[in-house]
Amino acid sequence: MSSTTSPKSVLAEPVEALSFFARLKKKAALRQAQGGRLLLAAASVLAFATPATAQTVAITGGRVVIGDGGDPIDGGTVIIRDGRVVAAGAGVAVPAGAQVIDATGKWVTPGLMSGFSRIGLAEVDADGDSNDTSASTSPFNASLDIAPAINPAVSAIAVNRAAGVTRAVVAPSAANSIFAGQGAVIDLGGDADAITRRRAFQYVELGETGGVRAGGSRVSAHALLRNALREAGQVRAPAGTPADPRTIEPAQERAGDVMLTRFDATALIPVVRGQQALMVHVERASDILQALALKEEFPRLKLIIVGATEGWRVAAQLRAANVPVIANALNDLPASFEQLAATQSNVGRMRAAGVQVAIGQLNEDETRQLRVMNQAAGNLVALTRIPGATGLSWGQAFAAISSGPAAAVGMDDEIGSLRPGRRGDVVIWDGDPLELATGVEAVWIDGVQQSLENRQTRLRDRYRNPQEGALPHAYSPRD
């Protein structure tokens, strides 16, 4: 028989203790299904989590949002089994023995995904020793891989998880070169294994910032980028091998005037071969066109344009090139000379032209505030009601913070929606997720329900009803 619980009562269950082991178990199963290898040390831990892993969850009666741009489905059902979405929509049968959660009057959606962030790389920006967003004095650039620096315990991860964010694209910051290194896609689960895909893309700065990093001008930045890709193309490495300098033949001679180290050149091999995306940050329309022109010499490049404040001016070219864009939702100020044509209608105009657009948190003061992305998406919906402005439909706006970012990094077959086979990242809301007053009631990542507790809720609870003379002397996250 199935058991029935409301979202509120589900939250009262002791989910935190199970999440760590259950999510490790499910991640191991997911990786095995994809041909991955399970570490022996992890396997010994996973033996304790078998009961939680076998659970099937049925969320019934809610307003279901698939996340693919379509309209919400009233009275829908979502089935999660073994960490994956099995079915979602109307008329879905509830499997025998499933834990049934009544979501009547609630909204049920895929977890939110940020198309660009730096979450997990720093707790406090001002503390340089613990800030891993950039490597200003490193001898390496393109070969840098941010995955080892991701810290799942930073407070921002739990805070954003409680707001319905389940995945994020995390990019490094360029410091002494146009190449910042290789970014990752992570989950915001409450365990020690946050990496969904490491080396998901190579991040490059062009435009004004790229010019500064390359020696003072855009001319230098483009010369450096093209030369780097040419050098990588000349390196002999077996096809299909990972980006590892050890794949280069030891006896291979490289020209004496090469600019890249063996490590950086090898890291760019997958980029030239089209096996790893090249994420390029540009804002100005002419800079976007120059980035697109790279495909003339390097036709296998899988470009992703980030920023694109003036993307609406070259939307036709972006669509023709079939290049996805990750943009700030509402940039409308000429903050620099490369953003003079900024407009809040940028995302809407690009989408209307057929460009695949996702929303990210690009401004330095918001790269860890992922929880505001649904507010930004809601504002894009509101723009459709303003004469002369171009926004997004509700379905398009939600897709821009769910399946859109996943598609941009080539992972929409794994995450970002409630289509069958996707990872079980599901959120129950008490109302429209694009409305400011709406709150999160429950979150699942990889099919495991997550704790919504975080540093902010602990502070709230501790000081909600203070008594005179009874205030603690200091706050400890372990209390």
Regions from the PLM with identified roles:
Residues 124, 131-137, 142-143, 277, ...:
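His/Asp/Glu-enriched, well-ordered alpha-helical/loop segment
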